[in-house]
Amino acid sequence: SKEMAAARAPGFTAFGISMVAPVIMAFGTDEQKAKYLPDILSSKVWWCQGYSEPGSGSDLASLKTKAEDKGDHYLVNGAKTWTTMAQHADMIFCLVRTSQEDIRQKGISFLLIDMHSEGIEVQPINTLDNTPIGHHEVNTVFFEDVKVPKENLIGEEGKGWTYAKYLLEFERGNGYSSELYQQLQQLKA
């Protein structure tokens, strides 16, 4: 990002590179690393983030999107909202509830879901800053009986909260780092 800042290029939001890749590298299987990391690095596959849910505000642990164990796959039902660029995404990394526990964070798992799967619907959220008119960035993503292979589970079932906290170390600020670097250089000049 220093090179981009030096060239005065705008920052970018690459959910694959800046968010899910570190999680896959730290907690994914060798097969997941081989399958996903090359396409993330080349930007062949575009990712979006499925954390927030309608009616939950910033309380991620209150999530209701459920992934039911069906043997060789999960059956996912629920919705995610404020999902940036979901209309262009090939994959979504998603927090889902795989069990009901006394401590809500313990029943959460981290799944990688193909956005082209049957049962996924993306609806735009029109905001005041949609520019130009008719374009949007954020969406609600609905999951209705979406089959997700078990091999798309990152790490262990029920440990998604740990992986989500790890991801948040990379999420905040990455999109602005080149702009901040540019401003710092201007102040020094």
Report each predicted region and the residues it spans.
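A structural signal for short hydrophobic beta-strand segments in well-ordered beta-sheet cores
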Residues: 65-68
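Glycine-rich beta->alpha junctions and the first turn(s) of the following alpha-helix
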Residues: 15, 121-189
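Internal helix-loop-helix
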Residues: 1-34, 38-44, 85-91, 156, ...
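A short core secondary-structure module
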Residues: 73, 77-123
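A short, Trp-centered hydrophobic/proline-enriched beta-strand micro-motif
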Residues: 43-51
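Structural signature of FAD isoalloxazine-binding scaffolds in flavoprotein oxidoreductases
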Residues: 59-63, 142
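Short loop segments at secondary-structure junctions
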Residues: 27-29, 70-72, 97-101, 115-118, ...
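Short Gly/Pro-enriched turn/cap motifs at secondary-structure boundaries
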Residues: 13, 55-58, 82-85, 100-102, ...
